[in-house]
Amino acid sequence: MYSSVVHLARANPFNAPHLQLVHDGLAGPRSDPAGPPGPPRRSRNLAAAAVEEQYSCDYGSGRFFILCGLGGIISCGTTHTALVPLDLVKCRMQVDPQKYKSIFNGFSVTLKEDGFRGLAKGWAPTFIGYSLQGLCKFGFYEVFKVLYSNMLGEENAYLWRTSLYLAASASAEFFADIALAPMEAAKVRIQTQPGYANTLRDAAPKMYKEEGLKAFYKGVAPLWMRQIPYTMMKFACFERTVEALYKFVVPKPRSECSKPEQLVVTFVAGYIAGVFCAIVSHPADSVVSVLNKEKGSSASEVLKRLGFRGVWKGLFARIIMIGTLTALQWFIYDSVKVYFRLPRPPPPEMPESLKKKLGYTQ
């Protein structure tokens, strides 16, 4: 199974052309069938490591942050748009559980009433909103991670790395949600209010006419409640899971793994992180869905009305959606980094100075 997943990773569209050279002969000259044999080829892993050192920019440079933001646009915009049908059913289960009783029932009712085109409702605000969110989420995460690491210093950055991941991701998501909120509000109106509007072009002017700018940003606080814990879990859990996989599961160091093998680890760690993300952020997601559907309601009123059981409606659908979503996002984001030859630091190791202080080395 592992080899088959590696094969899929090799075939991913973001596989960098320079990596293929390793397999095609960069690792060592091939022997000419008509001439004397050439020198033995170096191992593929060592050659891959040599290529890996040829980065297109410095870690923490402006170009690095811009390309990370581009990776966020591609990873978030495409994946969220691809899962619009599941997201639509999930939202309808949250706002009208009597009508949409389960995932399968929700799909059945939607297909019966709206046809296959109905499953794509809200794709435009989803694509625009989550592309903007991905730009800020991944781009600013890298910015804040470097900023906070420099503030802490090498030793403290290692000792407090989980807190560093949590702080950097929370800071990034704060700004990402401001970019997402208007499109998220329009998406929920389109998906959950029959007859309100079928397109973003129809929904946005109507929302502004009815409630002004408040219509687009009244859900930003619940969005922070949903997305900041989600993103903190997404990044911190992913970073520590990658670290654990290389330490306890993968049978060789990361430096000896090929790029496709590293991307498989990325995908697995992303899915594990996604499951926890869905659970942590689901209650706030339910509040956001109901709040954006109704006029004049507040987050506290919606939360009180839904109750403990109500806020967990649609959790199974969201676990499937967010698990798949998070895994694909990390896979695509890491693939973009590989394609543009961006620095991809290995899992953190204890600094030598700290090892000496703790008596691990002489």
UniProtKB/Swiss-Prot annotation:
Localization of this protein: Mitochondrion inner membrane
Transit peptide stretch: 1-49
Membrane topology category: Multi-pass membrane protein
A Pfam family annotated for this UniProt entry: Mito_carr
Spans through the membrane: 64-86, 122-141, 162-183, 219-238, 262-284, 315-333
Keywords annotated in UniProt: Acetylation, Membrane, Methylation, Mitochondrion, Mitochondrion inner membrane, Phosphoprotein, Repeat, Symport, Transit peptide, Transmembrane, Transmembrane helix, Transport
GO biological process: mitochondrial phosphate ion transmembrane transport; phosphate ion transmembrane transport
Side of membrane Mitochondrial matrix, spans: 87-121, 184-218, 285-314
Family of this protein: Belongs to the mitochondrial carrier (TC 2.A.29) family.
Complexes and interactors: Interacts with PPIF; the interaction is impaired by CsA.
Protein name as annotated: Solute carrier family 25 member 3
Organism: Bos taurus
Lineage, opening ranks: Eukaryota, Metazoa, Chordata, Craniata, Vertebrata
Gene assigned in the entry: SLC25A3
